[in-house]
Amino acid sequence: MSEQLGSHITTPSSHDDASKDKRPAAEVVNGSGIFIMADLHTGKPITLKCGLTLPNRLVKAATAESMAPNNTLPDEKFQNLYRHWAEGGWGMVLAGNVQVDANHICTATDLSVDHSLSDSKIVEAWRPWAAACNGNGTVTVMQLCHPGRQSPAGAGKRGLFAKSIAPSAVALQMGSGLVAKAVTALLFGTPREMSVSDIETVVSQFARSARLAAESGFAGVEVHAGHGFLLEQFLSTKSNRRTDAYGGTPAKRARIVVEVLTAIRAVVPAGFCVGLSLNSVDLQSQTELKDCVEQVKLITDAGVDFIEVSGGTFENPTMFLGPEKSRKQAQLGQPLAHEPFFLDFAKAIRPHVPGVPLIVTGGFRSCQGIEETIAGGDADLVGLARPAVVNPLLPKTTVLSPKTTEFGPEIEDGDVTLYAKKTEAPWILKQIGIRAVEVHIDNSVYHNRRHAAKQVRRASVLLQFPSRPSLSVAAVDIDNVISRLSTARPFVFIFLAITVEVNIDTDIAALLLALRPSPELYHLAAAMPPRRSDGSADHDVPDWPKTPHPTPYDILAMRKDDPYTKHRFFQLVKIYHPDRHGHTPAVHRLPHATRLERYRLIVAANDLLSNPSKRSLYDTQGVGWTGDRPPTLNESVRHAEKSWRHQPGNASRNATWEDWERWYDARDGKTRDPMYMSNGVFATLVVMMCMIGAFAQMSRAEQSGTEYLETRDQSNLAIGQQISRTTLVSAGRSKDERVDSFLRERENVAYEFTPSKYDDRTRTEA
């Protein structure tokens, strides 16, 4: 048991003195306090141009947390979330997606800089966040962004009908279908072309945001010029059609980026790290590659300490879904289909940026791929986003951990993969033609995990006792001790180093000894009474009167001369309210009808005793209390005991196809044999269905054609008769003949143009 559990523990604090002697000779301790193999290139430190030394080559890439409060400033949730990454042993953590202007943001829950707030107000909110990020000496760099035309209507403080800004008035094209075009036009519209004054304002906003980040304690900033954001919009010819000083040539399109970097360098202290996130370009287009290389040289000369290579925009989100080629490889099940998306572009620009470390982000899913990229010199650092969300302790527990430990056998690097769940959008949503919808579906699981992590302040070992939920293990420095772990959703605890399920018979002390947690970090919480969701224990549940016919005074535990208070009433409502059934185990055991009847009596007692006139009438005359009235027939049927519906094994509990399968298996005492179908039979069924559909369509077409011909013949006949009558009326005839014709026409009109004898005779004579 101890060997099995211990094999998951890689925290240095869990190794005692005896275990230190057993470490392999090739094992060393890096700057993050992690035991790594001496020849592992991923674990070697690197020094940036600014003098900042990173302990290893793993970077927690920037992510959009989308959980900022209304004031757009980080709160305790951000501290909790980034504290997990700070404990993970990352070489650098990119705290992502901070918008430099609260008027232009990507989502309503983005962190941003509200320039109506003072510097002190912003620094006061950022400083605790930076302290949490910098825990354990982790180097944290804040990513600064401006979405430009990718800011939807209503997302910022600029107003619902105010336009977003962009280098040129070029609208987003998020799909070619009518639905995609309509949705894009509604959400984003056509941006307003920026004036020179607007550009100067954006440059100053980047500079102020960087200065505030430095004052708050961050080690640096990363200027986001990728993913289709404003600065990338200036760099690209697709969105920048200007002919002034900020467009027309590669150098002019890069001018705003150079100005932003120069302005930041002017306001931050020496040694402050300034990096850049850059989009990859199509290597098949020599023109695009040539322009990009020219721009990268200008940006490098402006002074950057690293360049992060990524890719994708809102129009083509390859940063999430990967390039088209990689997606096709993944569908075919080819190996390494998800390995680095943008490594080829990094290789192409590497010779043109000597001395500038390159970070490649996107698509790394194996330790082998990471190590080969670093060892081969194709990149200096590797950025991980989704794997970092799944496991914030990834460097410490997986990538940089030694191959051989005292707890288990050697694990080959080629067998170690990084989990990153891929969630496909439903077929019907794909037909809309908006790739961003697929991205939203795919990102939902990681978004949920980030929001789960923000609830936990700190924990590295988690013990889950399904059969004894009153016990828990938690870190002593957690304010809110983690309890009742078995009732929580499983994905909440993927952020913790280990989750162990044990039996009620397991010796808790022996288990803790086997895990060997550091005594200054962990302790076993004492057995606690089960807690309700409102925070009170079960022993606080008020007793129900023992008498079979309680009075309102009995129910609310009052004497006749006591002044009325709602304290007891509130307690009982929290317990017996129909929406809270099951929150208190002691009450949950009561039949459903009994709970409802008690709740009715509680409400009736409160209504009577809280009204002085009703209470006086009840005290003197004994009227107004309905607790003893016999139930009506309708109430008897409605409140009849129906707990049998909720008994285990009852068919009424089945809600899905899987429930019915399990129910039949339990009833029959065996698993039902599945019915398999060969490929030939399946193909035959498909062909038959197609033939049936074809015959049905052919029959419908023939019937429709026949009906059309009959309708056409009837219409031609009616038109011919009308023409014949009109011709006869207009011919030269005597007065008597015209009167006679008029009378017959009137007769025909009355009888819906039924042919008269005169018409028949005329047609026959003709």
From Swiss-Prot:
Residues 1-24 are annotated as: Disordered. The chain crosses the membrane at residues 675-695. Residues 1-13 have a biased composition (Polar residues). GO terms for molecular function: FMN binding; oxidoreductase activity. GO terms for cellular component: membrane. Keywords: Flavoprotein, FMN, Glycoprotein, Membrane, NADP, Oxidoreductase, Transmembrane, Transmembrane helix. It comes from the Eukaryota. Its main location: membrane. The keyword Transmembrane helix applies. Residues 14-24 have a biased composition (Basic and acidic residues). It is an enzyme of class 1 (oxidoreductase). Belongs to the NADH:flavin oxidoreductase/NADH oxidase family. NADH-dependent flavin oxidoreductase; part of the gene cluster that mediates the biosynthesis of ilicicolin H, a 4-hydroxy-2-pyridonealkaloid that has potent and broad antifungal activities by inhibiting the mitochondrial respiration chain. The biosynthesis of ilicicolin H starts with formation of the tetramic acid by the hybrid PKS-NRPS synthetase iliA with the partnering trans-enoyl reductase iliB since iliA lacks a designated enoylreductase (ER) domain. The cytochrome P450 monooxygenase iliC then catalyzes the ring expansion of the tetramate to the acyclic 2-pyridone. This is NADH-dependent flavin oxidoreductase iliE.
